[in-house]
C-alpha cells in the first residue's frame, strides 16, 4: 500500500493541524454583531410635502375681457401653426429607415426555388425514361 505522502488525493499533513487562533479578531467580531442593521423598507410613493398641503389654494384669475381672449386666441393659433409646420418638416426630413430595409431583400432572389424546379424536372425525365424501357 502506498504511503500517505505519495497519494495525490490526500491533503498534506500540515493541513490537519488547526491554525493559530487570533484573539483580537474574535474580539472585533463580537462587537460587530451587537449592532443590527434595520431592514430596508420598500420605497414609499412620493407624496407632496406637508408644507404644500397647508398652503392655501391660489385664487382663480379674474375673468378676461372678450377683446383679450380674441387677441390671445390669435397668438395661440399662430403658435400652434408654427409648431405643426416644424413637426411636419422634421418628419419629412427624417431618414426613412423602414423603407430602406424593406427594399433590400427584394432585389436578391433566392436560388432555392430554381434548384428545386431543376431537380424535379430531372427526376421526372428519369422516371419517364425508366417507364419507356419496360
Swiss-Prot record:
Residues 1-10 have a biased composition (Basic and acidic residues). One of its GO terms (cellular component) is plasma membrane. Residues 23-48 have a biased composition (Basic residues). Signal peptide: none annotated. GO terms for molecular function: DNA binding. It is found in: Cell inner membrane. Keywords: Cell inner membrane, Cell membrane, DNA-binding, Membrane, Transmembrane, Transmembrane helix. Can interact directly in vitro with the compound agrimophol, a phloroglucinol from the A.pilosa plant, whose extracts have been used in traditional Chinese medicine to treat pulmonary infections. Interaction with agrimophol leads to disruption of Rv3852's DNA binding function. Disruption phenotype: The deletion mutant displays no growth defect or morphological abnormalities, and shows no difference in nucleoid position or spread. Loss of the gene has no detected influence on the virulence of M.tuberculosis. Absence of the gene disturbs polar localization of Wag31, resulting in disturbed nascent peptidoglycan synthesis. Deletion of the gene does not phenocopy the effect of agrimophol and does not compromise M.tuberculosis survival at the pH levels found in macrophage phagosomes. The chain crosses the membrane at residues 111-128. It is a single-pass membrane protein. Residues 1-68 are annotated as: Disordered. The keyword Nucleotidyltransferase does not apply. Binds DNA in vitro. It has been proposed that Rv3852 plays a role in nucleoid organization and may function as an anchorage to tether the DNA to the membrane. However, it was later shown that it has no influence on nucleoid shape or compaction. It plays no role in virulence and only a minor role in the control of transcription, and does not appear to function as a typical nucleoid-associated protein. Interacts with Wag31, an important cell shape and cell wall integrity determinant, and facilitates the localization of Wag31 to the cell poles and the cell wall, thus enabling nascent peptidoglycan synthesis. Cannot complement an E.coli hns knockout mutant. Expression in M.smegmatis results in altered nucleoid morphology, defects in biofilm formation, sliding motility and change in apolar lipid profile. Homodimer in solution. Is probably able to self-associate in higher oligomers along the DNA molecules. Interacts with the N-terminal region of Wag31. This is Histone-like protein Rv3852. The gene is hns.
Amino acid at each position: 500500500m502506498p504511503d500517505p505522502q505519495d497519494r495525490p488525493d490526500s491533503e498534506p499533513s500540515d493541513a490537519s493541524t488547526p491554525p493559530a487562533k487570533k484573539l483580537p479578531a474574535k474580539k472585533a467580531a463580537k462587537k460587530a454583531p451587537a449592532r443590527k442593521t434595520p431592514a430596508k423598507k420598500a420605497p414609499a410613493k412620493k407624496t407632496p410635502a406637508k408644507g404644500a398641503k397647508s398652503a392655501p389654494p391660489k385664487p382663480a384669475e379674474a375673468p378676461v375681457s372678450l377683446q383679450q381672449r380674441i387677441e390671445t386666441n390669435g397668438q395661440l393659433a399662430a403658435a400652434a401653426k408654427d409648431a405643426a409646420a416644424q413637426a411636419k418638416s422634421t418628419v419629412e426630413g427624417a431618414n426613412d429607415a423602414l423603407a430602406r430595409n424593406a427594399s433590400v431583400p427584394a432585389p436578391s432572389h433566392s436560388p432555392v426555388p430554381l434548384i428545386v424546379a431543376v431537380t424535379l424536372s430531372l427526376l421526372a425525365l428519369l422516371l419517364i425514361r425508366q417507364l419507356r424501357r419496360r
